[in-house]
């Protein structure tokens, strides 16, 4: 089963590389980024443009509403269906994105944690708001010591998630992780690379891109999200730039302050992406962006434009 996996930090040039490969090899570009699934965030997540999407088939982009707490498990299910369709069409699947957990699920499998009922999630979130993360971390230490030992006492999101699972299922996260979903792609036939640009140049590009976003629709996206009154803990509401821009629109930050926060958050995220892939998926080949087309062409026996 042939497939190409293109990972890398945000703003590293993944989309252009994937599109060039899709056009040259008859491929379908499959989103492997947890934020680009949201239809409400085309600008702020730097999704491919409509013009780019016309050049080659693109799947799993913008198919989820911001009100949905979309999970890695949901993505795996969606990706499995898309992968079957792409192979039936005789096209090359090209998975592209920066979400390490999605790539890990592709090649190594994923824990099969069942959905948490809304009433359980809402109850845990209410206690989190009322009592604070430290109190819930103490509760987690009693109910799932292994998870509590792994999490910092102020890690609101992960503490809440671990408590939701043990409360809904009666079993700790580790039990579910031990019995998971098999990988979608076997190791053989998979070409996997991580675009690794120079850090300083990448950070400059991130800063410039966020300024362009702010002038090209990002504020309108943030305003539309803010008007919906969604839970601020939803993934879409935590996308880089969204909280700061909403605060700016509410008069709490200047435009310059909001942009600076968005830039800093995005640079920090890029740094975490380097670290995560280095330790979690060492089988990915690290390639400089300027060398990526030649490297891919040699691997696949073709010339990329």
Curated annotation (Swiss-Prot):
It is an enzyme of class 2 (transferase). InterPro entries: Dimethylallyltransferase (IPR039657), IPT (IPR018022), P-loop_NTPase (IPR027417). GO terms for molecular function: ATP binding; tRNA dimethylallyltransferase activity. One of its GO terms (biological process) is tRNA modification. Substrate binds at residues 10-15. The keyword tRNA processing applies. The record marks 99, 121 as: Interaction with substrate tRNA. Its EC number is 2.5.1.75. Pfam families: IPPT (PF01715). Its cofactor is Mg(2+). Keywords: ATP-binding, Magnesium, Nucleotide-binding, Transferase, tRNA processing. SUPFAM superfamilies: P-loop containing nucleoside triphosphate hydrolases (SSF52540). Residues 33-36 are annotated as: Interaction with substrate tRNA. ATP binds at residues 8-15. It catalyses: adenosine(37) in tRNA + dimethylallyl diphosphate = N(6)-dimethylallyladenosine(37) in tRNA + diphosphate. Belongs to the IPP transferase family. Monomer. Catalyzes the transfer of a dimethylallyl group onto the adenine at position 37 in tRNAs that read codons beginning with uridine, leading to the formation of N6-(dimethylallyl)adenosine (i(6)A). This is tRNA dimethylallyltransferase. It comes from Afipia carboxidovorans (strain ATCC 49405 / DSM 1227 / KCTC 32145 / OM5) (Oligotropha carboxidovorans). The gene is miaA.
């Amino acid at each position: 089963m042939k497939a190409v996996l293109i990972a890398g930090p945000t703003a590293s040039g993944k989309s252009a590389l994937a599109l060039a490969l899709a056009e040259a090899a008859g491929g379908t570009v499959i989103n492997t980024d947890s934020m680009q699934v949201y239809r409400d965030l085309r600008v702020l997540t730097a999704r491919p443009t409509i013009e780019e999407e016309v050049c080659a088939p693109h799947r799993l982009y913008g198919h989820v509403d911001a009100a949905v707490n979309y999970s890695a498990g949901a993505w795996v299910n969606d990706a499995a269906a898309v992968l079957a369709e792409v192979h039936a069409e005789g096209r090359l699947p090209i998975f592209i994105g920066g979400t390490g957990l999605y790539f890990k699920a592709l090649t190594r499998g994923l824990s099969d944690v069942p959905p948490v009922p809304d009433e359980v999630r809402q109850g845990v979130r209410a206690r989190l708001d009322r009592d604070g993360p430290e109190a819930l971390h103490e509760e987690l230490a009693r109910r799932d010591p292994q998870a509590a030992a792994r999490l910092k006492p102020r890690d609101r999101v992960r503490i809440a998630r671990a408590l939701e699972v043990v409360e809904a299922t009666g079993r700790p996260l580790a039990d579910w992780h031990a019995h998971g979903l098999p990988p979608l792609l076997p190791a053989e036939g998979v070409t996997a690379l991580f675009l690794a640009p120079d850090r300083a140049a990448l950070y400059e590009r991130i800063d410039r891109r966020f300024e362009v976003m702010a002038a090209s629709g990002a504020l309108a996206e943030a305003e539309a999200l803010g008007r919906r009154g969604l839970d601020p803990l939803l993934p879409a509401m935590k996308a880089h730039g969204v909280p700061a821009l909403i605060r700016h629109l509410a008069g709490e930050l200047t435009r310059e302050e909001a942009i600076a926060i968005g830039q800093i958050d995005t640079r920090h995220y890029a740094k975490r992406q380097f670290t995560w892939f280095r330790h979690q998926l060492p089988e990915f080949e690290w390639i400089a962006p300027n060398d990526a087309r030649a490297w891919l062409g040699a691997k696949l026996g073709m010339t990329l434009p």
